[in-house]
Amino acid sequence: MTEELKTYTAQEPQIHFGTGGWRAIISEGFTQLNVQRVAQALAARIISQGVADKPVVIGYDQRFLSPEFAWWSAQVLAANGIHVHLIDRPAPTPMIMWTVKDLGCAYGMAITASHNPAIYNGIKVFTAGGRDAEVEITTPLQDAANALGADDIKLIELSQAQAAGLISTQTSMNWYIDSILDSVDVKAIRHAHLKIVLDPMFGVSRTCLQTILMTARCDVETIHERRDTLFGGRLPSPSSKTLQALANEVLERGAAMGIATDGDADRLGVIDNTGKFLHPNEILVLLYEYLLEEKGWHGPVVRNLATTHMLDRVARAHGEQCYEVPVGFKWVSSKMAEHDAIIGGESSGGLTVKGHIAGKDGVYAGTLLVEMVAKKGKHLSEIYADIVAKYGQLEMIETDYGFTMERKAQLLEQIYERHDLPEFGQVVDHVSYLDGCKVYFADDSWVVIRFSGTEPLLRVFAEAATYEQAQGIIDQVVAYYQLA
């Protein structure tokens, strides 16, 4: 069996780290053996770097078999003589990152497929400081894991590892919650007496967000809070479609807002007081303006190339810079550190703020948004209306298209090698192939065409002054490449 495995994996590796870690279908690619191959490859890396004396934090989400995958990973690391801090309950990914940073660990792991469909699970790897592992780490890690056979994996009985002190449970949730409470104006939130509806989307944010908001004396109602490994039949990703139940609850209860997080709580979704879904782009703009205007912070902003250029307008108005990076939050956090940026984020719902962790955190972002509403004394809808009055409006559309591997190869060659692009019928300022293909038009509109790093999809984003103009750009791309 071992020789067959080695032959198979040499021809067709089953582990691939993309922009959001490694994700695969449970029992197809995401198996006990493959997970333990990643753990063994990580253990070998830790030992070769001479940091085996530092513990590794492992956490997990609410998905099917996530606790078991976490224990199986811990077994391998412990068998290699590495101490594992296993978080004692399903935990938000940002809490796992925070724990890696707080305990001074060299590495950490999260068993999660984030916002992917329920049939998936995955692994995210973190490095010192609680940062997403960069491609210089994940590529050698995946290559090493794919080269391993079953007999190359070291194992130890869990009872033996625990008795030897190699595996211990970690109860860091209270510390993480306290760190967020210490970073916001709890007194202002208490005085506002806000009614908030939470939607953890059957994920891991319930305990943290409930505790934070109830400590700040918010009136909190929660839906979709139990564990459901099928996520209620929905994609655990906040969007206008998946948050309709939350919107209904906000309107029915007369709440100030609804807050949702994705499956592992690193992404945020918000419903305003009118029941409208606030796009992550709008949340980023709101918080950047709030940090600059209300909190008196100074500094640039970082966004990925598929995120609104409204951030550029806010930055220019305050004499600041807006830096553009490829998709993948590790690029955002790296550029933030390089330029001492005060906020960074992406249109898919992830953001972080200077002084917190170097990764996206839906729990922290949601709490900061509550502070903003409390201190400004206005509804979210009114606050964003003020933004539009000041900076104008940009509309963004995102569409996804499936493909066969043959069709993907054709599109890669046509777009990225031959640079064969539609005419578009408007002035093109320049084209970038930094990550996929981005066309910048002279009127400040743009379009991005790129393959997802986490799902088998081709994504097309367009932003323009009006929805109709953005849709027109999308339609030209779809027609030219025959995507529909």
Question: What positions do the PLM features span?
Answer:
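Buried hydrophobic positions in well-ordered alpha/beta secondary-structure cores of metabolic enzymes
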Residues: 20, 58, 96, 109, ...
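N-terminal small/polar loop signature for handling phosphorylated ligands or for N-terminal nucleophile
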Residues: 44, 52-120, 211-271
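Proline/glycine-rich low-complexity loops and linkers
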Residues: 88, 95, 143-176, 273-345, ...
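Gly/Ser/Thr-enriched, mixed-charge loops and adjacent short helices
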Residues: 2-12, 121-253
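Short beta-strand-to-turn element immediately C-terminal to the catalytic PLP-Schiff-base lysine
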Residues: 125-128, 269-273, 353-354
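An N-terminal, well-structured beta->alpha segment
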Residues: 1-80, 106-107, 163-196
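Gly/Ser/Thr-rich active-site loops/lids in small-molecule metabolic enzymes
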Residues: 134, 222-224, 276-295, 362-370
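Phosphate-binding and adjacent anionic-ligand microenvironments
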Residues: 256-257, 297-463, 467-484
